[in-house]
Every structure is written in structure tokens, then in C-alpha cells.
């Protein structure tokens, strides 16, 4: 979406991952992968707005939710049944009973199902009711006021806090603003909470920090974490990277001295951050506006990049330290620089001194 914007590959991948009905097991047997598939459809819809594809895939979304709803326990929480894998991340978290991070994903799926149902002219009220019930239960059982954070498990009695559920609580806007500030202080900015060691979940954490305006911290993390792999000779980004691990053990994984994937697609998220938050491309597709550009030029000494705008075209940004040049090859763009808003017209160039 922020590099090649190939809607066709996106659609074929979505369909291939889901497979045919009836659904008899989770995608890759992983509970959260099924939920992420649903969220992926929503992400595709945001980027391309393809109603025809949405109508094609909607029945599979409904049946996947029905499959998940059949795997709930007494409080309405989604749990792993026999041969299900509750994964979330390669991390030491308390997975006794229902896992909080999983419920955050599950709640986000109810909201997505409601929104997409309504977009297609269908009744989404049942999904909204399920969302309200689930989020109320999450607050009741998983929020720990003393710790100012969500705990992994309420059944074990350990009150263990990891980053994952708390990141999802902010990312999916499940926690209110007051709780989000507590999470920022007590979890995300707390070095006593174990750091994330996969590029995969670093994506979610950095996305949250970007949304909270912490761009300097995110840029520092990109330079230190992904840059740390480059310093060790990486030419592609890895499945997992823990800077504290000795160099001679960096390729260890799955009990194999060379078991780690050194070219893993889930590690490509700097492309997303740099394009969305630093170059500032936001695909909105509403009220006659296709995209908005809010470039954060204070983070660049110079810049020259071409970004895709859905399937509609591209936009080029060139910056020499004084003059920003924007060349639009897509309809319906707006350049926002502080309070100033400048219309971007396909085939025309805008030059602004900053």
C-alpha cells in the first residue's frame, strides 16, 4: 500500500489465506492470524475502496467470525481450543486462560464487522453489541488500576504486564484517553517492561507511538533497531532481532543455530512509518478527497520520493531544505502545512518555500 500498492496481489493473498468454507481451523492454526485476516480486509478496503471485492469476501468474513464465536468461554472471551495456537508474539507472556491481547484483536474485529456490514447496506447492530459487551468484559477482568495497565491473564493471579495487550488497547482505541496516558507512562515508556524483540510486533508499538505524536522516538528506534541489523551485516531484515543477544547467537531460533529467517516480510515496516507519518501520506477516500499529505519536513535534510495513492496514481515529494515540490499524478489530493491547505491536482506541480 505504501510501496507498490498492488491491489490485485493484495486481493489474491486475502482470498488464498482465508481458503474455502466451511472453516474448520484457524489460519495457520493461529487464533490471532484469523483475527488479523479480518483486520487485513478492512485495511485493504481503506486503501482501495473496492466495493466489488468487499462484497465478494464479506461472506467469508461472516463465517470466520461465526467460527471464532464458537470458541468463546463463559465470559465471552475467545480462547484456543485443542490444536489452536494462541501466538500474538515471540514473547514471555502469561497465557493462562483467556489472553488479553487476543481479546483486544477480537474486539477490533467486531467493530470492523459492524462498519463493513453497514458500508454494504447490511445490519451491523449485532456486531456492535458484541463489541460493547466484550470491551466491557475486558475492562472488568483485565484492567489493573494499581499497575495502570492491562494484565495478560486474570486467571493465573500473577497480574503480569507485557506491552502487547496495552499496545492493542491504544491502537484499536479500546482504552479511553486517560488509560492511554497511563499505558504510555507505565508500559511503553517503562524500561522495566520487557522490550519487544520481533520486527513484527515492533510495528504495532511504533504505530501507536506515531499516533501519539512520538515521531522522534520512532525515528530513533528505526535507526537503532533496524539499523542494528544493518550494522550486523544484514542485507534484508530478519524474523527476530534482540540487540542484547551476542553476535554469534543472532541466527539462533527454533532450537537451531541457523533457524532464523533472515528475509522476513513482517520486518518491512519502516517503509510504512516513513511514508505514512514522516512523508505524511494519509489515504482518506471520503468527501471528495482521495489523499492528504502532511509531510514532517523537520525530520529531513533533503527528500525525494514517489508514493502510491491507492490504485489511482502517485504523488512525488522533493525537498532541498528550502523548497518543497509536490507533483501529483492522482486525483483529489490536499497538501497540509500547518494551517495552510493546498489543493493537489493531477498533472500539476505545487512549490512551497518552508
What function would you assign to each model-found segment?
Residues 216-354:
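Non-catalytic C-terminal accessory modules of carbohydrate-active enzymes
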Residues 75-89, 179-187, 226-228, 233-247:
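Flexible glycine/proline-rich, aromatic-decorated loop/lid segments
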Residues 1-14, 26-28, 32-39, 44-102, ...:
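Active-site acid/base region of carbohydrate-active enzymes
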Residues 1-6, 37-53, 104-122, 167-177, ...:
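Well-ordered alpha-helical scaffold segments within catalytic/enzyme domains
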Residues 22-25, 85-97, 152-155, 186-193, ...:
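Short beta-alpha connecting loops at secondary-structure transitions
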Residues 20, 156-159, 188-196, 224-230:
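Solenoid-like repeat scaffolds
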Residues 25-39, 70-77, 139-151, 196-211, ...:
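Charged/polar, low-hydrophobicity segments characteristic of intrinsically disordered regions
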Amino acid at each position: 500500500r505504501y510501496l507498490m500498492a498492488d491491489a490485485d496481489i493484495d486481493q489474491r493473498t486475502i482470498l488464498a489465506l482465508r481458503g474455502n468454507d466451511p472453516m474448520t481451523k484457524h489460519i495457520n492454526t493461529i487464533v490471532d492470524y484469523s483475527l488479523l485476516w479480518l483486520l487485513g480486509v478492512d485495511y485493504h478496503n481503506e486503501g482501495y475502496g473496492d466495493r466489488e471485492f468487499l462484497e465478494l469476501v464479506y461472506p467469508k468474513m461472516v463465517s470466520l467470525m461465526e467460527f471464532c464465536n464458537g470458541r468463546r468461554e463463559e465470559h465471552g472471551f475467545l480462547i484456543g481450543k485443542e490444536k489452536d495456537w494462541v501466538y500474538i508474539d515471540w514473547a514471555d507472556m502469561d497465557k493462562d486462560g483467556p489472553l488479553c491481547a487476543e481479546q483486544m484483536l477480537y474486539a477490533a474485529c467486531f467493530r470492523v464487522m459492524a462498519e463493513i456490514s453497514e458500508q454494504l447496506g447490511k445490519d451491523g447492530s449485532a456486531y456492535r453489541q458484541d463489541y460493547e459487551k466484550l470491551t466491557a468484559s475486558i475492562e472488568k477482568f483485565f484492567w489493573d488500576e494499581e499497575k495502570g495497565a492491562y494484565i495478560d491473564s486474570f486467571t493465573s493471579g500473577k497480574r503480569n504486564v507485557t506491552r502487547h495487550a496495552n499496545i492493542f488497547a491504544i491502537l484499536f482505541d479500546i482504552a479511553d484517553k486517560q488509560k492511554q496516558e497511563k499505558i504510555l507512562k507505565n508500559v511503553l515508556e517503562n524500561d522495566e517492561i520487557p522490550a519487544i524483540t520481533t520486527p513484527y510486533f515492533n510495528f504495532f508499538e511504533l504505530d501507536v507511538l506515531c499516533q501519539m505524536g512520538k515521531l522522534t522516538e520512532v525515528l530513533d528506534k528505526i535507526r537503532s533497531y533496524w539499523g542494528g541489523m544493518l550494522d550486523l551485516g544484514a542485507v534484508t531484515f530478519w524474523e527476530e532481532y534482540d540487540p542484547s543477544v551476542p553476535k554469534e547467537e543472532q541466527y539462533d531460533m527454533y532450537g537451531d543455530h541457523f533457524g532464523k529467517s533472515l528475509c522476513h516480510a513482517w520486518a518491512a515496516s519502516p517503509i510504512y512509518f516513513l511514508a505514512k507519518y514522516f512523508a505524511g501520506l494519509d489515504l482518506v477516500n471520503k468527501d471528495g478527497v482521495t489523499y492528504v499529505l502532511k509531510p514532517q519536513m523537520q525530520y529531513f535534510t533533503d527528500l525525494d520520493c514517489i508514493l502510491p495513492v491507492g490504485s489511482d496514481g502517485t504523488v512525488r515529494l522533493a525537498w532541498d531544505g528550502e523548497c518543497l515540490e509536490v507533483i501529483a499524478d492522482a486525483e483529489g489530493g490536499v497538501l497540509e502545512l500547518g494551517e495552510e491547505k493546498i489543493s493537489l491536482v493531477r498533472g500539476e506541480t505545487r512549490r512551497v518555500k518552508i
